[in-house]
C-alpha cells in the first residue's frame, strides 16, 4: 500500500475517535467522554505491547491486515515472562494468518478479534477469539476451543 494511503487511513480512524470524544464533551456527556478517552488510551497501550515484541513477521502481517481489512477491531492481552516469543515468530504469524483467514468467512459486520499471549516456564499460549455476530460456526479449525454464534476461539500452545 502506498504511504499516503496508509497515512490517510490512520488519520481518518484517529479523527473519527477524536470527533466522537469532542461530541461527548460538547453535549456535556463527561462520563461517556471519559470512558471513551480511557478506552482509546488502553487500546493504544495494548497494541504497543504487541508491536514491541521481537516478532517482525507477525507484526508485519498484523499491520498489513489492519490496513487492508476493515472488518476487524483488535484487542490484545499480553502477559509474557521473557522474550522467547521472538524464537517462534514464523509459527505465530502462521497461526494469526490462519485464524484471520478463517474469521473473514464467518462475519459480515465489524467484529472484535482478541489476541492473547501468555507464557509459563514450559510454553507460550496464544489464544485468538472472534466475537461479534458470527454467521457460520461450522467446519471450525482443529485448534478450536469454543464455537457458538457469539465467539469462536482458537488456541495454539508452543512448547519452549
Predicted regions and their residues:
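Short beta-to-alpha transition helix within the HATPase_c
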Residues: 53-70, 137-141
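Conserved ATP-binding N-box helix of the HATPase_c
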Residues: 11-27, 86-119
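Conserved catalytic submotifs in the C-terminal HATPase_c
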Residues: 75-83
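Flexible, glycine-/charge-rich segments associated with ATP-binding catalytic modules
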Residues: 26, 140-160
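Conserved signal-transmission helix
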Residues: 1-3
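Conserved beta-strand-loop-beta-strand hairpin that lines the nucleotide-binding pocket
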Residues: 79, 93, 109-138
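Active-site alpha-helix of zinc metalloproteases
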Residues: 8
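Histidine phosphotransfer helical core of two-component systems
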Residues: 18-59, 82-88
Amino acid at each position: 500500500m502506498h504511504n499516503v494511503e496508509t497515512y490517510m487511513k490512520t488519520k481518518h480512524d484517529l479523527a473519527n475517535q477524536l470527533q466522537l470524544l469532542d461530541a461527548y464533551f460538547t453535549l456535556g456527556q463527561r462520563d461517556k467522554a471519559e470512558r471513551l478517552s480511557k478506552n482509546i488510551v488502553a487500546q493504544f497501550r495494548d497494541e504497543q505491547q504487541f508491536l514491541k515484541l521481537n516478532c517482525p513477521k507477525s507484526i508485519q502481517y498484523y499491520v498489513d491486515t489492519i490496513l487492508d481489512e476493515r472488518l476487524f477491531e483488535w484487542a490484545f492481552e499480553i502477559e509474557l515472562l521473557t522474550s522467547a516469543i521472538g524464537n517462534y515468530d514464523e509459527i505465530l504469524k502462521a497461526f494469526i494468518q490462519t485464524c484471520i483467514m478463517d474469521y473473514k468467512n464467518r462475519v459480515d459486520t465489524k467484529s472484535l478479534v482478541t489476541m492473547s499471549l501468555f507464557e509459563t516456564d514450559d510454553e507460550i499460549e496464544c489464544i485468538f477469539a472472534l466475537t461479534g455476530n458470527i454467521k457460520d460456526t461450522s467446519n471450525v479449525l482443529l485448534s478450536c476451543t469454543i464455537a457458538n454464534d457469539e465467539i469462536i476461539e482458537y488456541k495454539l500452545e508452543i512448547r519452549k
